[in-house]
Amino acid sequence: MPRKIESLFLAGPAGRLEALLEEPDQAAVGIALVCHPHPQHGGTMHNKVVFRVAKGLRRSGHVVMRFNYRGVNLSEGAYAHGEGELDDARVALDVLLSRYPALPLTLAGFSFGSRIALRMGCAPGGLAPRRVIAVGFPTVYKDRAFLDNCGVPRVFIQSTRDQYGPVEELQPLVDALPEPKQLIWIDAQDHFFAGALEQLEESVIRLG
């Protein structure tokens, strides 16, 4: 039987938001929200890295929601410097939680989206996700106060040749963070995991 894929429009703060909801082939063990990269640099929910992360989560038994930030493809509104995009992600998360309130939550994101996921997951207020998966975390952004004193389990997955989050910058950053945390390096050609997308997907599956 083909898996269920539902196309949605969510009521976002700047207009409707385009989203996709995918259920796993097996009984669901959790839910996951996946945030895409920077909307002003071609980022969409159909980005190949986002797709692979979402696929890995679905294959490991998660109901997965992807969405487009305001102003991307069929989502209404305009870029809002990260703050509006964070609000968009919260709307998508609320919809996901309302549909599956009893399942444990994973937040995930790629590049700019990894910051959005971490900001949501590490914010005070009782969200308490099972974990946050930060793929291709960009160290070029220096405002990282949201990582301080974050007790949520965080998994960083990074290309060994990431030009926006190189080894020599990300390794000490993660080393300095409080537990629980994990850093997975993948031998890929660039920030977008060229030549290693299958390994990325398998790494997500192994997280369970």
Region spans (language model):
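Short beta-strand/loop motif that positions the catalytic acidic residue
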Residues: 150-151, 155-158, 162
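Short alpha-helix in the alpha/beta-hydrolase fold that links the catalytic acid
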Residues: 152, 165-174
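Catalytic histidine neighborhood in serine/cysteine hydrolases
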Residues: 176-192
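Serine-hydrolase catalytic machinery in alpha/beta-hydrolase-like enzymes
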Residues: 10-12, 16-102
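Acidic catalytic loop of the alpha/beta-hydrolase fold
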Residues: 160-165, 191-192
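Primarily recognizes the serine-hydrolase "nucleophile elbow" in alpha/beta-hydrolase
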Residues: 87-152
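Post-His helix in hydrolase/transferase enzymes
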Residues: 194-207
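A domain-start/cap signature at the N-terminus of enzymes
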Residues: 1-8
